[in-house]
UniProtKB/Swiss-Prot annotation:
Organismal lineage: Bacteria, Pseudomonadati, Pseudomonadota, Gammaproteobacteria, Pseudomonadales
Cofactor(s) in the UniProt record: prenylated FMN; Mn(2+)
Subunit record text: Homohexamer.
Subcellular location: Cell membrane
Reaction equations catalysed: a 4-hydroxy-3-(all-trans-polyprenyl)benzoate + H(+) = a 2-(all-trans-polyprenyl)phenol + CO2
EC nos: 4.1.1.98
NCBIfam families: PRK10922.1, UbiD family decarboxylase
Gene Ontology MF term list: 3-octaprenyl-4-hydroxybenzoate carboxy-lyase activity; metal ion binding
Designated name of the protein: 3-octaprenyl-4-hydroxybenzoate carboxy-lyase
Originating gene: ubiD
Amino acid sequence: MQYRDLRDFIRGLEQRGELKRIQVPISPVLEMTEVCDRTLRAKGPALLFEKPTGFDIPVLGNLFGTPERVAMGMGAESVDELREIGKLLAFLKEPEPPKGLKDAWSKLPIFKKVVSMAPKVVKDAVCQEVVVEGDDVDLGALPIQHCWPGDVAPLITWGLTVTRGPNKDRQNLGIYRQQVIGRNKVIMRWLSHRGGALDYREWCEKNPGQPFPVAVALGADPATILGAVTPVPDTLSEYAFAGLLRGNRTELVKCRGSNLQVPATAEIILEGVIHPGEMAPEGPYGDHTGYYNEVDSFPVFTVERITHRHKPIYHSTYTGRPPDEPAILGVALNEVFVPILQKQFPEITDFYLPPEGCSYRMAVVTMKKQYPGHAKRVMLGVWSFLRQFMYTKFVIVTDDDINARDWNDVIWAITTRMDPKRDTVMIDNTPIDYLDFASPVSGLGSKMGLDATHKWPGETTREWGRVIVKDEAVTRRIDELWDQLGID
């Protein structure tokens, strides 16, 4: 099932019993976080707060609170189907040369489909049904969540930020949290390596002193939202990928005040500029680590215009100690990552990002080991192949007889197949999440790799232990007798 816009997705979720309308007044200040957190931990439905205290605009929360709803948003019927999306991305990232004419013809439909999903620009769009400009702009009219008691101010969380660098034809889509500091100003918290920050830096170099155009889409269709957090190849735009997920081209409309193009069916659009040099201290905020982050300075985004649909819906979330929505997204997108990694490293049999590891800070890899040192090659590959894992602090690699998603198995492998000194890889001075206060320097820290595989000659001089395996005939006989034993 594919969804044209957020409202279409809401209807689809409601028909499946995956969305609950909340008629009781609930405040965006702390209360929505409590309700959404309890619901997410119970694997409950998406929530549409129809009467947020003090506001006329409904708030949509816990939208991607289960892996199943993430899969639905990507046009898949089950989480398992996300592997097929991963296979498509793996192919597009590094397409294999055709083995012959027949093979070339078989791959042609894939490329034709990708080309046919180029975004479609429209003149009129529902996201511009209502236009608010100049002194009438007031972010205080939006039910922006204040998520945690120690948060400094309301925080925009699901904004899809649209930018374009001066040297690029393609726009960048990124999701960056935005602290509200005035009726028309927010702080754009983008890290220096992220697409929006790179576009801004290039703009300042080429157009010194000139304001940098920015747009933020709130309440886009699910395919576009999820396309912005998926490892899309650099040769494929997020909008085109969203079209592939949705099954039809993404409709875009030109902003009223710039040449940026935004999702035409989004609920709310913020248009404006960043004035070079205008910075402000951001935070503290409770984040996905379960802690409040330290204060740091980031650019200020001045909102010059708000356009929106009639009776818009505000899409929001919170981040905190896992499980939260980012952790659930990580669980679902994990299935997309597996085929992409296997394309580069066919020896990998599974890859798992434990949600307890704050979405990406720890990875467990199982593999078919083929030579001494092989596990170390794989762990180094995980850190370097996809930029999504540049902040992964711990990589555990073990054999394919281990279930990467079962801590009982993983811990057994670590404690029986590892020598701490020989099998631990430490790398210093590597990129680390700026929200990671455990690193000695902000944005720079170490990584640890754990080789929990069976050791080959060259890695050890000792006779390696043999795993105990039960006798299959005895197991079958006891299976047949079990009911007669009266044990359970």
